Amino acid sequence: MNNLILVKYASEIFLKGLNKNKFERKLKENIRKKLKDIDHEFITDQNRWFIKSEDLDGVIERVKKVFGVKELCLVTQVTGDFNSIKEEGLKKIKESKAKSFKVETNRANKKFPMNSMEVSRAVGGYILSELGDEIEVDIHNPECKLYVEIRGNAYVFTDKDKIKAVGGLPYGMNGSTMVMLSGGIDSPVAAYLMARRGVETHCVYYHSHPYTSERAKDKVKELAKIVGRYTEKITLYVVPFTEIQMDIIEKCREDELTIIMRRFMMRVACELSERKKIQSITTGESIGQVASQTMEGLMVSNDVSDRPVFRPLIAMDKEDIMDIARDIDTYDTSILPYEDCCTIFVPKHPKTKPRVKDMIIAERKLDIEALVNKAIDEMETFIFE
């Protein structure tokens, strides 16, 4: 008998038709990369994936964070004869100390002499005969579910052996995006959600030295590292933004500062994406959350983008965003009290219904191309693996 990890991938991958094999290959590749320094063996048994290793805890901790994996199960492999199956089933139920149980069987090996229902009945009957009054069958609400997978070999486990994974689609299968990463709660969650959909994720942070400290930059670097735990690696571009902000403050009206700064952030992200061959932009904006995130404000920001702009948090409540941030371990870092460029130079009464034509007129006083190119030319690059 061997203890293995059964890897179950997202059911959405089954719906990919002729592309299903590409998604499976990419997912296997990503799993192997995560386990590159852990001795392991990848086993396929009639379209089921299993991982064998002496360090099962280490494997679980890493693979559960691989996008595309929806669940891991710690299973016991037995020979494909009924006696081995029923004995292991009895052992699992005893270990669970449950007072009620149910058996579910998946018989992929059609050469096995019993069908799925017959296996479930026979294993359940054997457990009842051995444990007597200590336990009962409850098919509707059992304390423990016993699972039997019959393939080339047989695999036995319970619902207590299941570990929830992140789900989503294999990272790197759905293009690329540049995330406008701040030090707040929202943008790291947006980065995570895009990566979870298989989008290769890069980040840009706008640093306003000396108005924002090095600790603010370090905070954003830490957030990028945390998001990078779920990806193969992540690149963070730190763009100096002070000169742009000061020029806007000097030449534009106070109530237009926020939206013009947002338009410059979008321009920088687009130009950087063009240089790095990245296909889209992602922001952490949520409709109505702050003054600049009105429908009109978002339209004015989009006006300067030459590529798709994704806002995965657009319809989410703040509490829901915070819950995800806690789940992915970015929350505690995000709430550290260091200001970023979005929280300084904020006007008392920002425009909530800006118009594109007004912004175009206001920006005529600014040398847009020179400001954008200079900021990108002076940026820092950090790669976290």
Curated annotation (Swiss-Prot):
Subcellular location: Cytoplasm
GO CC annotation, single: cytosol
Gene3D superfamilies recorded: 3.30.2130.30, HUPs (3.40.50.620)
Molecular function GO terms recorded: ATP binding; CCA tRNA nucleotidyltransferase activity; tRNA binding; tRNA-uracil-4 sulfurtransferase activity
Pathway assignment: Cofactor biosynthesis; thiamine diphosphate biosynthesis
The protein's enzyme class: transferase
Gene Ontology BP term (one): thiamine biosynthetic process
Domain of life: Bacteria
Pfam families: ThiI, ThiI_fer, THUMP
Positions that bind ATP: 180-181, 205-206, 262, 284, 293
Enzyme Commission identifier(s): 2.8.1.4
Keywords associated with the record: ATP-binding, Cytoplasm, Nucleotide-binding, RNA-binding, Thiamine biosynthesis, Transferase, tRNA-binding
Domain THUMP as annotated: residue spans: 57-160
Main location: cytoplasm
Heme found in the keyword field: no
SUPFAM superfamilies for this protein: Adenine nucleotide alpha hydrolases-like (SSF52402), THUMP domain-like (SSF143437)
Chemical reaction(s) catalysed: [ThiI sulfur-carrier protein]-S-sulfanyl-L-cysteine + a uridine in tRNA + 2 reduced [2Fe-2S]-[ferredoxin] + ATP + H(+) = [ThiI sulfur-carrier protein]-L-cysteine + a 4-thiouridine in tRNA + 2 oxidized [2Fe-2S]-[ferredoxin] + AMP + diphosphate; [ThiS sulfur-carrier protein]-C-terminal Gly-Gly-AMP + S-sulfanyl-L-cysteinyl-[cysteine desulfurase] + AH2 = [ThiS sulfur-carrier protein]-C-terminal-Gly-aminoethanethioate + L-cysteinyl-[cysteine desulfurase] + A + AMP + 2 H(+)
Keyword Nucleotide-binding: yes
Family designation: Belongs to the ThiI family.
Role according to the record: Catalyzes the ATP-dependent transfer of a sulfur to tRNA to produce 4-thiouridine in position 8 of tRNAs, which functions as a near-UV photosensor. Also catalyzes the transfer of sulfur to the sulfur carrier protein ThiS, forming ThiS-thiocarboxylate. This is a step in the synthesis of thiazole, in the thiamine biosynthesis pathway. The sulfur is donated as persulfide by IscS.
NCBIfam families: tRNA uracil 4-sulfurtransferase ThiI (TIGR00342)
Descriptive protein name: Probable tRNA sulfurtransferase
